[in-house]
Design a protein with these regions (language model features):
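Short, conserved beta-strand element in jelly-roll/cupin
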Residues: 39-43, 53-72, 108
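Short acidic-glycine-tyrosine-enriched beta hairpin
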Residues: 8, 74-92
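Hydrophobic ligand-binding cavity/cleft-lining segments
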Residues: 1-15
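Short beta-strand segments
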Residues: 49-51, 72-77
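Acidic/histidine-enriched, glycine/proline-rich intrinsically disordered or flexible terminal extensions
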Residues: 119-152
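Structural motif
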Residues: 21, 60, 67-69, 76, ...
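A short glycine-rich, His/Asp/Glu-containing loop-to-beta-strand
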Residues: 13-51, 57-58
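Ligand-binding loop in jelly-roll beta-barrel domains
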Residues: 69, 89-115
Length: 152
């Protein structure tokens, strides 16, 4: 029988990355690694990562609640609940919560490659290492992702 995945609010894997929380909803095991899904919660006034590019996966963001600002190269998009932002491979991007309310984003990865990146960052923190630009870039590099230094 085909396996079905049901992830409840209490059963999701949770990775705390400083003030940002990532809940892993699908890590690729059920989808043959074609799709990964996470839920990102950004507290008010929380920046995201520096602009970066993924070489081997698409990334999607669906705004569930709150508001987010997406920066893609030099262009910004203010996204209200119900907005979907799809980032193709190679596009420089970042996101942030500039508002006074928490922002919840449904985050997709096709294929699921980037789920392990968040686990790697969580492991660094669990081992007592602070996240630095150097160790974050090193972790990114394992998943075909590079900083978009031309938009730093």
């Amino acid at each position: 029988m085909t396996q079905v995945s049901v992830v409840t609010p209490a059963s999701a894997e949770v990775i705390q990355l400083g003030p940002t929380r990532m809940r892993i909803l699908e890590d690729g095991r059920t989808t043959g690694h074609r799709l990964g899904i996470g839920e990102i919660t950004l507290p008010p006034r929380t920046p995201g990562p520096p602009q970066h590019r993924h070489a081997r996966h698409d990334e999607g963001f669906y705004v569930v609640s709150g508001a987010a600002r997406f920066t893609v190269g030099e262009t910004t998009y203010d996204a209200a609940p119900g907005t979907l932002v799809m980032i193709p491979p190679g596009a420089p991007h970042t996101f942030a919560n500039l508002g006074d309310e928490p922002t919840v984003l449904l985050n997709t990865f096709t294929p699921d490659l980037y789920v392990q990146y968040f686990r790697d960052l969580g492991q660094l923190i669990a081992c007592g290492e602070p996240l630095t630009p150097e160790n974050t870039i090193e972790a990114m590099s394992r998943y075909a992702t590079t900083p978009a230094t031309d938009y730093a």
